[in-house]
Amino acid sequence: MIHSKKLFLFYILTLIFIISCNQQQTRTEIKTIGVVDMKLTSPAFANNDAIPSEFTCDGADVSPPLIISDAPSNAKSLALVMDDPDAPVGTWDHWIVFNIPPSTKQIAKGTEPYGVAGKNSWGRTGYGGPCPPSGTHRYFFKLYALDTELNLPEGATKKDLERAMKEHIIAKAELMGTYKRTR
C-alpha cells in the first residue's frame, strides 16, 4: 500500500514537471516569434516571384529597389546579403553590405545603400545580379537587424560577416526571387 502511494505520488510529480516544462517551452516560442516583425519587400517583384531581367546579367545588372519596414528600434545597424543556394559550386554570394544605418527605409534601384560593402563571390564589392548557368535559381535577399555596428573592413566576405553577426542578430527579414535565363 505504501509502495503504491509513493508510486502514485511519483507519477503525479512527474506529470506536473512535464506540463510545466511544456508550458515554459511554449512561452519561449511565443517570445521568439514576437521579436521578428521586420519586412523586406521590392516594388519590382513579389516574394517567390521571378526577378525581372533588368536586375540580372541579361539586363542592366542593377540592384532592384528594396523597401525596409519595421526594423527594431533598438537596432544599431543593418546587414544585407543576397545569395544563390542553387549555384553548381555551392552558395554564390551576389551582394553583401553591412553597417547600414537602421533608419534606412529603402534602397533605390541601381544604388548601393550607405554602409560598408563586402566582397561577393566574383571577388568584387557591389551588386552582381542573377546569372544562372542553367535552370531556375532562387535568390535570397536577407536583411539582418543587429544590436551593434560591426568592426569589419570593406571587402569582408559573407563568412566574415556571419562570424561577426553571431550573437548580435535581433531580427531578420527575407525576400526570395527566382530567375531563369531565356538564352
Regions found by a protein language model. Name each.
Residues 9-10, 36:
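Generic detector of short alpha-helix boundary/capping microenvironments
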Residues 21-183:
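N-terminus-centered regions that define maturation/targeting leaders and the start
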Residues 10-18:
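Bacterial N-terminal signal peptides
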Residues 2-9:
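Bacterial N-terminal signal peptides that target proteins for export
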